[in-house]
């Protein structure tokens, strides 16, 4: 999955960027207070994308 597609999915479901790390970005679900890191790679493995959504308590991306 493309990183930009995952970021769009997260933002559509109420997540926002909390801060930028050295090689990753931290996104937070403001409704639940949960956060997760998103690596800065062009491609993100489907398993990792599902894990990020699970951490943020969101449905898995399509």
Predicted regions and their residues:
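C-terminal structural segments of small proteins and small subunits
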Residues: 13, 30-62
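Major-groove DNA-recognition helix of helix-turn-helix-type DNA-binding domains
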Residues: 13-29
């Amino acid at each position: 999955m493309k990183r930009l597609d995952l970021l769009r999915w997260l933002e559509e479901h109420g997540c926002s960027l909390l801060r930028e790390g050295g090689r990753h970005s931290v996104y937070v679900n403001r409704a639940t207070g949960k956060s997760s890191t998103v690596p800065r790679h062009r491609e993100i493995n489907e398993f990792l994308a599902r894990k990020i959504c699970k951490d943020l308590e969101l449905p898995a991306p399509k």
